[in-house]
Swiss-Prot record:
Gene3D superfamilies: Aspartate Aminotransferase, domain 1, Type I PLP-dependent aspartate aminotransferase-like (Major domain). The modification N6-succinyllysine is found at K231, K252, K413. Keywords: Acetylation, Aminotransferase, Disulfide bond, Iron, Iron-sulfur, Metal-binding, Mitochondrion, Neurotransmitter degradation, Pyridoxal phosphate, Transferase, Transit peptide. This is 4-aminobutyrate aminotransferase, mitochondrial. Substrate binds at R220. The lineage of its organism: Eukaryota, Metazoa, Chordata, Craniata, Vertebrata. GO terms for biological process: gamma-aminobutyric acid catabolic process; nervous system process. It is found in: Mitochondrion matrix. Pyridoxal 5'-phosphate binds at G164, S165, T381. It comes from Bos taurus (Bovine). GO terms for cellular component: 4-aminobutyrate transaminase complex; mitochondrial matrix; mitochondrion; protein-containing complex.
C-alpha cells in the first residue's frame, strides 16, 4: 500500500508562491518541489453535498447508539492522502482542520505506512502493554527517539499519557503533590494523613487551587474542566471547584494600530492574576499553580504578546507556585516552532508542559523537582501507547528531514497574508485576522455567519473549523504548502464574493 501511495504522485504542475497585489486578485503558484507532491492529491473532487446519502445513513445508524449530533461526516481513511480528506460518498476535500489539529504530516504518509509494514514492529501494534509495570524492551530507546528528542529546555522528566485531557489532569496532580511536599518537608506520610485522605478530608486532601484564564480549554475531565472556560455546554451540570479565573487579554487588531491599548489590556490581566493569588490565599484556597495556553485555541484563538507571557511566567516564581504550559493544540510545529511557547524566548519558560494531538500521544514534561516521590501516584493502566511512540519517532524524522517547521512558518505567512487581503476586501465578513505559522484564524460578525461560511466551504471542498463565539480557525498539517494556501484563498474569495 505504501509503494502504491508513493507511486500515485501528482502529474500536474503546481506553481510557486506569488500573488497579485490588487483588489480581486487571484493567488497563483509555480511548480512545487517533489517533496510537496509525493503523496498528495492534485486537488478537490466533489460528487455530492456533505454529508451525502451514504454518510446520512451512517449518521442515522450511529444516532441509534449514541448522540451523533456533533458528527460532521464519515470518512474513507483508506483513500485520504496528504492534505486531502475523503468522505464515504467519495468527496475529496482540502482539510484545513486536520482532525482538530491532530494530524502531523498528512493522511497515509508513505513513511508511516512503510513503518507499520516492517515485521519487527508488528508486535508493538498488536500488543498494548500496561506501561507502568510491564514495558517492552525498547521503550526507553523509543522515548529517546521520539518525545525526548524534542524535549523543551530544562525538561528531563517525562510521563506519557493517552490524550490531552489526561495529560493536563495528571500535570495538575503533579503540581499539587509538589506543593504539598514542599509544605510537608522530607518526612513520609503520617498515618493520620493516610486515613483522612481516604475520606476526602482536609488537611490531607488540601484545599489547593489552580489559577486558569477565562476562554481557556484544558480538557473535560473533572480537574481539567475546572480550568476550562470556553463553552458552557462543556461544563453545565458538572460539579466543580472554587478555583480562581483570571481574564485573558482581548487584543485589538491590527496590532500595530493599538499598541498602547493592548499593553494596557495585558497589564490589567497580569495585575488581576496577582490579585487573585493573594485573594485565594486569604480564602485558604492557596494557588498551587497557574495553567495557560500559549494561544487560547478552543476559546477563540486568543493571542497575547510574548512580553505578556514572559511577565506572567515571573508571577508564579515570585508567588512560589508552579507554572503549567498547555501546548496540546499549539505543539508539534504548527506555529513555526516545535512548541508554541518557544516564541517567548525564555530560558525557563515552564515547570510542567503538557502535549498531545500532533504528537500522536499524550504526556507531560516536568522539572526534576516535580518528580513523584512514590510509585502509583501518577499512574494508569496504559500510560500512553508504545506504538504511537514508534510512529512519532518517524514523524519527527520527517519533520526534520523535510524542514517542516520552516515550511509551517512560510506557508503560514502565505495564508495570513491572503487572509489580510480578504479582510481588506470583505471587512463586512472578516475581522481580527491573526495567526502564528499556519495557526491562523479570523472573526466573523456572528456565529450564524461563521457556521454558514464553514458549511459553504465544506460543500466547495474545504474543511474548516470554528472556535470561540464567532471565529474560524485553520489547523492544517505540517505538509500544508503555499499552493494549498492559495487554493483555499481563491475558493474562499469566491465564497465571500457570492455570500449573502
Amino acid at each position: 500500500m505504501a509503494s502504491m501511495l508513493v507511486a500515485q504522485r501528482l502529474a500536474c504542475s503546481f506553481q510557486h508562491s506569488y500573488r497579485l497585489l490588487v483588489p480581486g486578485s487571484r493567488h497563483i503558484s509555480q511548480a512545487a518541489a517533489k517533496v510537496d507532491v509525493e503523496f498528495d492529491y492534485d486537488g478537490r473532487l466533489m460528487k455530492t453535498e456533505v454529508p451525502g446519502l451514504r454518510c446520512q445513513e451512517l449518521m442515522k445508524q450511529l444516532n441509534i447508539i449514541q448522540n451523533a449530533e456533533a458528527v460532521h461526516f464519515f470518512c474513507n481513511y483508506e483513500e485520504s492522502r496528504g492534505n486531502y480528506l475523503v468522505d464515504v460518498d467519495g468527496n475529496r476535500m482540502l482539510d484545513l482542520y486536520s482532525q482538530i489539529s491532530s494530524v502531523p504530516i498528512g493522511y497515509s504518509h508513505p513513511g508511516l505506512l512503510k513503518l507499520i509494514q516492517q515485521p519487527q514492529n508488528a508486535s508493538m501494534f498488536v500488543n498494548r502493554p500496561a506501561l507502568g509495570i510491564l514495558l517492552p524492551e525498547n521503550f526507553v530507546e523509543k522515548l529517546r527517539q521520539s518525545l525526548l528528542s524534542v524535549a523543551p529546555k530544562g525538561m528531563s522528566q517525562l510521563i506519557t499519557m493517552a490524550c490531552g485531557s489526561c495529560s493536563n489532569e495528571n500535570g495538575l496532580k503533579t503540581i499539587f503533590m509538589w506543593y504539598r511536599s514542599k509544605e510537608r518537608g522530607q518526612r513520609g506520610f503520617p498515618q493520620e494523613e493516610l486515613e483522612t485522605c481516604m475520606i476526602n478530608q482536609a488537611p490531607w486532601c488540601p484545599d489547593y487551587s489552580i489559577l486558569s484564564f477565562m476562554g481557556a480549554f484544558h480538557g473535560r475531565t473533572m480537574g481539567c474542566l475546572a480550568t476550562t472556560h470556553s463553552k458552557a455546554i462543556h461544563k453545565i451540570d458538572i460539579p466543580s471547584f472554587d478555583w480562581p479565573i483570571a481574564p485573558f487579554p482581548r487584543l485589538k487588531y491590527p496590532l500595530e494600530e493599538f499598541v498602547k491599548e493592548n499593553q494596557q489590556e495585558e497589564a490589567r490581566c497580569l495585575e488581576e492574576v496577582e490579585d487573585l493569588i493573594v485573594k485565594y490565599r486569604k480564602k485558604k484556597k492557596t494557588v498551587a499553580g497557574i495553567i495557560v495556553e500559549p494561544i487560547q485555541s478552543e476559546g477563540g484563538d486568543n493571542h497575547a504578546s510574548d512580553d505578556f507571557f514572559r511577565k506572567l511566567r515571573d508571577i508564579p516564581r515570585k508567588q512560589c507556585c508552579a507554572f503549567l504550559v498547555d501546548v496540546v493544540q499549539t505543539g508539534g510545529g504548527c506555529t513555526g516552532k516545535f512548541w508554541a511557547h518557544e516564541h517567548w524566548a525564555r530560558d525557563d519558560p515552564e515547570d510542567v508542559m503538557t502535549s498531545s494531538k500532533k504528537m500522536m500521544t499524550g504526556g507531560f514534561f516536568h522539572k526534576e523537582e516535580f518528580r513523584p516521590n512514590a510509585p502509583y501516584r501518577i499512574f494508569n493502566t496504559w500510560l500512553g501507547d508504545p506504538s504511537k511512540n514508534l510512529l512519532l519517532a518517524e514523524v519527527i524524522n520527517i519533520i526534520k528531514r523535510e524542514d517542516l517547521l520552516n515550511n509551517a512558518a512560510h506557508a503560514g505567512k502565505a495564508l495570513l497574508t491572503g487572509l489580510l487581503d480578504l479582510q481588506a476586501r470583505y471587512p463586512q465578513f472578516i475581522s481580527r485576522v491573526r495567526g502564528r505559522g499556519t495557526f491562523c484564524s479570523f472573526d466573523t460578525p456572528d456565529d450564524s455567519i461563521r457556521n454558514k461560511l464553514i458549511l459553504i466551504a465544506r460543500n466547495k471542498g474545504v474543511v474548516l473549523g470554528g472556535c470561540g463565539d464567532k471565529s474560524i480557525r485553520f489547523r492544517p498539517t505540517l505538509v500544508f504548502r503555499d499552493h494549498h494556501a492559495h487554493l483555499f484563498l481563491n475558493i474562499f474569495s469566491d465564497i465571500l464574493a457570492d455570500f449573502k
